[in-house]
């Protein structure tokens, strides 16, 4: 959900800063450079070849109190200070974005009434997993696929170095799905200036999977697979979507009685906690990769 709809990051000679503008509009600043990744030394063209399928790049939790859940994540996993995106205020939210390897875990909280996040909290009955953001190599193709499926788009933006497409939650059982693109692919504008146009030093590992509670696991898995251009497999009473190139698995299971649909578990390679730890209504567990 970390989307700066009224702000854009631009280069100012020796640093990266932000200035006010509508997302997708031209800026008075200099366009972000399409350079090689400073952390790896690989060129943009070579890096782009690595990602030929979708990858889960970010997962968002929704919480009543952002600071409390963010503090629990830092305390449990030793993650560095999160990025707080001022742009999400226009969605009636506050947030914190943590780097987990070269992927990201976000916490959002509503600060205004009548927000999508607030309604989700009410349906779910408390804090929980809220959104899955997938990085795709060809956003135009992904958008065509979504249109062909009749899936509605509730928000989209196109910036020089990143673009995103939020899908209607009623068309994606279990969570909001976003299809995003980044250039260079290792960067991630939504994580703030340290990840904009460059890749900072970071711990190894990253997101390896989600568990999503839904009313109909088989139907939900087929829907997500169609959106992502992947394949679904039934494992009654659950169903699975695998993203083999990314080494990630999405597992759909029957929703618990009395709970709404939502993301209930996240696995992360390199996470210190081998035993699951529940934070913000989501079970976090480490996984070897």
Describe the predicted segments one by one.
Residues 2-23, 27, 33-46:
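Low-acidity, Ser/Thr- and Arg-rich intrinsically disordered low-complexity segments
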Residues 15, 47-48, 55-64, 96-101, 106, 118-209, ...:
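Vicinal oxygen chelate
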Residues 47-70, 127-134, 183-222, 227, ...:
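N-terminal beta-strand motif that seeds the catalytic metal site of vicinal oxygen chelate
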Residues 49-112:
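An N-terminus-focused feature that recognizes amino-terminal "leader" regions
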Residues 65-80, 141-149, 216-231:
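Amphipathic alpha-helical segments
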Residues 81, 115, 231-232, 259:
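Short loop/beta submotifs within extracellular cysteine-rich repeat domains
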């Amino acid at each position: 959900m970390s989307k700066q709809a009224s702000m854009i990051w631009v280069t100012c000679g020796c640093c990266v800063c932000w200035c006010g503008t509508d997302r997708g509009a031209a800026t008075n600043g200099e366009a972000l450079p399409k350079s090689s990744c400073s952390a790896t030394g690989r060129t943009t063209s070579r890096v782009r070849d690595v990602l030929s399928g979708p990858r889960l790049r970010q997962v968002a939790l929704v919480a009543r109190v952002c600071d409390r859940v963010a503090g629990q994540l830092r305390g449990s996993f030793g993650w560095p200070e999160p990025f707080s995106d001022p742009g999400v205020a226009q969605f009636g939210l506050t947030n914190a974005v943590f780097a987990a390897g070269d992927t990201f875990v976000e916490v959002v909280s509503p600060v205004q009434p009548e927000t999508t996040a607030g309604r989700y909290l009410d349906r779910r009955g408390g804090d929980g997993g809220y959104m899955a953001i997938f990085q795709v190599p060809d956003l135009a193709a992904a958008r065509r696929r979504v249109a062909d499926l009749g899936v509605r788009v509730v928000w989209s933006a196109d910036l020089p170095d990143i673009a995103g497409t939020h899908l209607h939650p009623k068309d994606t059982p279990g969570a909001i799905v976003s299809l995003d693109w980044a250039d260079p692919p290792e960067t991630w504008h939504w994580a703030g200036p340290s990840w904009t146009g460059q890749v900072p030093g970071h711990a190894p590992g990253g997101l390896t999977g989600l568990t999503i509670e839904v009313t109909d696991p088989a139907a939900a898995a087929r829907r997500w697979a169609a959106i992502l251009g992947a394949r679904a497999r039934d494992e009654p009473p659950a169903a699975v979507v695998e993203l083999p190139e990314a080494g990630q698995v999405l597992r759909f299971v029957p929703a618990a009685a009395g709970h709404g649909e939502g993301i209930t578990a996240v696995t992360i390679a390199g996470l210190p906690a081998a035993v699951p730890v529940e934070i913000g209504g989501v079970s976090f567990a480490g996984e070897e990769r």
